[in-house]
Amino acid sequence: MPSKPSCSRTASALVLAASLQMTTPAVADDAMPRLGVSPVRDVIQAMTLEEKVALVLGQGMAGMSGGMQGPVVGGDANSRVPGAAGTTFPIARLGIPSIVLADGPAGLRITPTRDDAPNQTFHATAFPIASLLASSWDDALVERVGEAMGAEAAAYGVDVFLTPALNLHRYPLGSRNFEYYSEDPLVSGKMAAAMIRGIQSQDVGTSAKHYAANNHEWNRNTINVKVSERALRELYLKGFEIAVKESSPWTIMTSYNRINGTYTSESPWLLQDVLRDEWGFEGVVMTDWFAGADAVKQMQAGNDLLMPGTQSQQQALLNAARKGQLDVQVLDRNIERILDLIMRTRTFRHEPVSNKPDLDAHARISRQAATEGMVLLKNEHDALPLAAGKKLALFGNSAHDIIIGGTGSGDVHEAYSVTLLQGLEHAGYATDKALSQAYAQHIKTEKARRPETNPFLAPPPLPELLPTVEQIDAAATANDVALITIGRNSGEFIDRKAEGDFYLTEAEQTLIRSVSAAFHKAGKPVVVVLNIGGVIEVASWRDQVDAILLAWQPGQEAGHAMADVLSSKVNPSGKLTDTFALDLKDYPAAENFPGVTLLGPDPAASGGIVINDRAAEVEYRDDIRVGYRHFNTRGVEVAYPFGYGLSYTRFEYGDMKLTREDAGFTASIIVTNTGRRAGREVVQLYVSAPKSNLEKPAAELRAYARTRLLQPGQSQKLVMRVEPRGLMSFDPAVHRWVANPGRYTVSIGASSRDIRHQAHFDIKDELSFMP
């Protein structure tokens, strides 16, 4: 999303903006058409060419620079909502206001202080990251989070929230995976649709992004993704299709990358043929900030709004229009969609801006959401939940310096955050004061040593404190349970690394080994809490500990939410929306991630940030074999499979009832809580297709459902519907979605590898659907 503004203001941008204004009549004429009063086409007809070009460019924050594209045209985002990403261009004489656009995926990203209000703060709620929200498998919960996010945007005068992000988790080292939902397109699309519905219920627009196949950061502005049409349609576009059809986002944001040689923002096939003609999208398409290479091609392809609008783009469009190389009707078409967007906004309706969102209420929603998406990966010897009154020894930097979310445009300026230490103490647990004081001093010292970095980048991790043998032995004697946290963070521009990120550092391995040995010698359990934004390796160390809680990056209420789950105030019910492999090399994308440079040395070898200046390419040789579609089809052993998650109680699945309807089917099943604690269960439905000329995964997720909170002994009937399209694969040879004749297997289970019931049905004649 928007790159960090340059530090210096660009005088030429202000001069150009001023000259543009001079080409516009200075005083509104009563005879002039006005937006919202006159027909939109009359308003467009009254615009000068310069105004038309200005309107399709948008505006950025003053002083922002786009590198080779030059400085932006200007804008009032900082004066309207400081820290917002940009605005559209206003034309006062025609009644056209500028509207405000702001990040981000886990909460509103704006500046918390303002020069004109020194005694007031403008914080936003930091909600859990998307990967955690998806792990709840709860569309209604995600919609409530969206409602809260939309309410904050409305309170601060933001018209379009630049979220949700729904690219697939193709590979664990993608540094923005925390912004995205899953390795599966159905989960991604359903979660994104829920988020969109929630935000837009507050009369605030959304921008589903990054369309499409934007799966890593390395060379993101130039990378060419070589991918089959089948993989595109079944995986990388499918989530967007679901979101568009189920929630009608006001805008779509194109990605930086190219697909099969064409920038996404310059692709008529992506923007017109697929998005508009096939899916029926009626909103605005905008670029990511400074994306693409040719403004004229972007306009012609149907990328309506170029953000944040640069001088070079402005000049290119003006020249092309004057020379007849850009049909003005193309501009008019794109402008009409932009004006339709503007008329939907609160700004256009002159809605008041309170600057007073209900942060307390939203913090409660954030806390609840965080608890629902945490995943219990391991729990031996009833190590969890923690009994009341237990004394706890907290090891690990992030237990005391919590990681609530990722960096870059996904960051949020929250009013506070709660550490695990604070959350457990608030929940009534005693903690080892000497140990926590040692960590506090270590963190303070290491932060003072750390050089100041670009705030848009993830800071380098602090070296992990390794307590002495004496300190660990003393803790094992004085405390009842050891809690070890493992923390990870990432964000824009730099993808994750294998060593010391996907794999534990040597210090972390030593910490787990030493603490486990001491506490187990004393007959006491060891619990690991994963405070991470993406998948890591667990197989090499999990046998040393008794329990593992995947807490993700849980937002500002992190410590309270973690304590809620560890104490059983909330029974964990989250399940994985990604596969945890045994090793990084087990992912098929490991073969050539992140890609290769086509000219010059490979900058990835030095860990450099490469944004604009190198041609690069990556071939998606894994094709449709992403995530569990690979692991389960090839029979690859994994650490934890897709859909997996434990509970403090047990659930029994009754017999499945399958009913065929209109070429699709409905499956129902009764789930009963047979344990001793109240809890929720997530049930997943997979479909296996017969062999055909196309390679097929062993099974694919086609539906899911989540029970309400079931008390011990209570049951609930869950019903899941699969439409005919859910049985089909895309056959590029005939350019159709096809369900071949033969026997189909429907599997219902607690994970992709914990199938409880199966049923079969036959299709006699081929079913097909033309895009």
Question: Which residues make up each language-model segment?
Answer:
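Glycoside hydrolase catalytic-domain context in secreted enzymes
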Residues: 2, 28-729, 738, 743-748, ...
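Bacterial N-terminal signal peptides that target proteins for export
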Residues: 2-12
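Extended, solvent-exposed functional surface patches
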Residues: 7, 20-22, 26
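Bacterial N-terminal signal peptides
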Residues: 11-21
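Intrinsic structural disorder/low-complexity segments
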Residues: 12, 24, 212-213
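Short beta-alpha junctions and helix-cap segments that line functional grooves
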Residues: 732-734
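Short beta-strand elements
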Residues: 754-769
